[in-house]
Amino acid sequence: MSIKHFNFFVSVRLTLRVLSLVCVMVLFGCSSSSMEFCVDSGECELAVNVLKVAGDIPIDPSDSFWKNINQVHPQIVELNPQMITNPKWPNPSVKSVNILGVQNESELGLLLEWSDSSLENKIEISATHTDQAALMFPLYPGKELPAITMGSENEIVNIWQWRAIWEPSISSKSRGNNRSSKALIAGSIHRSPVEDLTAAGYSTLTTQDEQNVSGRGVWEEKTWRVVFKRSLENTDSADVQFQHSIVMAIAVWNGDNRERNGQKGISNWILLRLP
């Protein structure tokens, strides 16, 4: 190859690379209907393909619906140590989760599944150190990806957080005849074990006035299976709208390992690819 041809080849490669970077910066400039750029650019670790289904999406993770869907191989998502902010957590006990996504004409359902050898169901402990899982979405997906540390002032995120202690079956078993346990749970009855929140960085987690996410978790055979469900679109300006494919992140806390707040395992951004 001559010097002239080599220089031309390098110039073309640089031009393509610049165009790719521009694509990433403007997000939808090169893909008006999705966020596929994050996979191509390496900003997303992997993609989860959501399956289109007919009929209702059950909230019970033990429903045969999910067992049949499980015939479609779930995506394995690795969870990383949280080493960005204090208290850092170099060794989270949950290293990975399986995720399945389904969508009908009006709703999105996501099933998380991970191994957990112990169910922490002592209410006195679980009030602060309970098994938990959360999904995080950028509120404005047309902008650059938010910081993985729960967004920032200009990059607000919508978070769905499930807590085992809010599961009615677990709460009732945990209380028993212990008066102090009853006192702890009094006035803390939740309509759903999943809370709809927003955040603009660490220590800014805020409960929304409107709670639009439902869910349920079941612990069987040393495994948690948790369903999150919400309408694809709504009128709440604090909620993410699922009009197109979008990025998301996953976090898991193991109460038995004394994990809470920033002490968790967290994924990188992944693409939730809608049908």
Show where each model-derived region lies.
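N-terminal secretory signal peptides that target proteins for export/translocation
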Residues: 1-12
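Sec-dependent signal peptide recognition
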Residues: 14-21
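Acidic/polar low-complexity flexible segments
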Residues: 31-71, 125-186, 234-275
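Short, well-ordered beta-strand segments enriched in hydrophobic/aromatic residues
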Residues: 61, 107-114, 224-230
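Short amphipathic, basic-aromatic surface patches that mediate peripheral association
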Residues: 116-123, 236
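Short helix-loop boundary/capping segments
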Residues: 170-218
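Exposed beta-sheet edge/beta-hairpin loop segments within beta-rich domains
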Residues: 215-222, 238-242
